[in-house]
C-alpha cells in the first residue's frame, strides 16, 4: 500500500464533477486500481466490532463507497459513481448492501435522481429499486431525458416486509404569494414512497405539497425564508427538504424535514398526526432540549405510550450556522403527556463540529453509537456513556463530504478473481508478488504458485494475509505467477496467471 496526495484529481460519472483541490492523502496498490482515502484514525477506548461503511463526494479524490477497517485497510471499494447512503441491511434474512446510485445535485439544492442498488454478499447487484414514472419534473437546469429512475439520495431504509422507504423531489408549480413569493411560483416538492424491493410496485406515496393545509409554508419562514427562490424551475423553493423516513409499528410513518426543523408522524391516510418541532415543540413540550436542521430521524424501543427518537442535530445549515455545534440526540418522546425530553447528547468537546448539511446517528447493539458528520468528513464512535472513543477522518472539513457513515459486521464473498501483480527483483534473485481481492473478508493466507511456463506452475510460498494488499518476496526468478486465497469456505479465490514484469 502506498499513500499519495495531489492537488488535482478529476472524477466523473453521469456528470462532470469539480476538480479536487484537496491534498488529503489516498492509498494506491500495485495489484488493484482502487484508491481509497487514507483514514486518519485516533482511538481512546474500545470500539464496537465491524467495518466502517461510508461514501465520499464534493472534492473527494474518488467518488465511490467504501468498506474499511479501523486500521486504515480497505475491504471493498465500489466502481466510481455518485453513490450515497451506503450501509448493511437485511433482506429475506440475509445481509445486503444498499446505496443510492445516480446524479446528486449539490447545495443549495441538495437532492438527487437515481436508483437504490441492492447487492448481495458477493457484491452482485440483485435489485435496482426504482421510481420510473410518477409525473416528475427535474430541476430546470438538468436534462432528464436519460433518467432511469427518480429516487432521491436521502433514504433507502429496508423494512421487515421486504419493502423499502425512499424519497423523491419533484419540481412543480405552487402559489407562494402567502409568504411573499410569486403566485405562479415553483417549489421542490418532497415525496416519499414505500416500494416492493423485488417488483418496484409503489405501495404508498406521500407528497408534502398535498398537505400544505397541515404543514403551511408560513411555518418554515423563520428557518428557510423564500427570499428570491421560486421564480422559475431552475431555482425552485425547496422549503420542506425531506431527509429520512421510518415506519411505526401501526403502519404510519415518521419523516424528517430539514427546513421545518421538524419530525412529522404521517398516518396511513396521509394526514399529519402530530408535529415535533425542534425549536417550539410543535404539538409537544420540549423539556430542556432544542435542535435545528436535523437529519436521520430513527425510531427505537417503540411502546404504546412513546418511543426513543435518535436524530443527527446539525444545528447548522446554509441559512444559519456557526452558533451551536452539531451533536447526536437521543430523545424520549412521550405520546401520553406530549413531552419530549433528552436522554443523551453525543458530541466531542475536543473537536466541536458545525455540520451544515447531511449526517447521521447510528445506535449500535452494544450501546455505542456511530455518527457520520456529512459536510465534515469524519466518523466518530461514542461509548454508552457518551464519550468519544474513535475519530476517523478522510478529508478536509468543508472540502470532502459523506452523506452518511455506519459501522456493521460484514462477510464479503466475491465471485470475482483476486488481483495480482508480480515483478522481478533480479539483483536479489527474487520475485515480488502483490495480491489483493476486493471485498473478500474470510481468507487468512495466500498460496503462491510460480514457474517458467504458463501451464506448469508449482507451489513456491504460503504467506499470511496482511491487509487489503499483501506483498511477498519469493526466492528465484519466476516467469509466471498465480495465487490462491486460502481460508474457510473459500471456493473461487484463484487469480489469473500473470507474467512477471521485468522491473518493479
Predicted regions and their residues:
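Fungal secretory targeting signals
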Residues: 1-20
